[in-house]
Amino acid sequence: MAKLLLGKEVTASLNEEIRKKVETLNAHQITPKLGIIRIGEREDDISYERGATKRCETLGVSYEKFLLPENASEEMVLNTIAQVNEADDIHGVLLFRPLPRHLNENKIINALAAEKDIDGITDRSMASVFLGKQGGFAPCTPSACLKIVDHYSIDCTGKKAVVIGRSPVVGKPAAMMLLQKNATVTICHTKTTDMPSVVKEADIVIVAAGRAGVIDAKYLRAGQTVIDVGINVNEEGKLCGDVNFADAEPVVDAITPVPGGVGSVTTSVLVEHVVDAALLKAGLDIL
């Protein structure tokens, strides 16, 4: 039976750190603030927004929503980004993606001020992740994966790690962050040949495949740590991950459940990035 890597334990510890940082800011008459830009009414965006704003309220971070219609023009979106860039009281910005197809996503993303890019979407932020340099925020989801690794004292040095999925949002940055922890990293994707054999070689597996239950027992072995990034709804209408939990849990050493794993940590990482952006702007140390 695998050890469950519970998001709530990581979140409790992380939230305590965030509260201390907020107290430091408050002592300097600063309230950290998140700007939220949402275009349209996608259910998953609204759900994430609800969780993010609730976490902000819990941790003493304010927020302001900038809601645009699905058919918003590129000019309208760019004007909104200019508005949040110029707003002195907004320290970090969450821009929901994917954007509607009629918009130039690359142009819009890179209009965001890099210092307010708390979800690592601009080219400058991504470059910081890939080069292993300070100066930008990594995307929140892979950051949450690494928070779990750190919290549970999972040693990456010299270990074989496999990341399943090569998206710029999760897979690629997660691989780079594991490299920075001295893991030997392989990225698997839809064109990988004999993927089960590749994944079985890994000590640490981060799964961001985007398909419910696609990773089953044939990919896994004893001794592995599995971090499941996926959030899907199965045929029974229940939340599930990209890993077949019933197959994996009796086999591997440790695994994140879905729900109750990476998702809740991601929300706290988002808030931490806003708070850290406020500290940086104020010239205060990030504790």
Where are these regions (language model features)?
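Positively charged, low-complexity intrinsically disordered leader regions
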Residues: 1-30
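Short beta-strand segments enriched in small/hydrophobic residues
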Residues: 31-40
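Short beta-strand elements in bilobed, periplasmic/extracellular small-molecule ligand-binding domains
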Residues: 56-70, 185-187
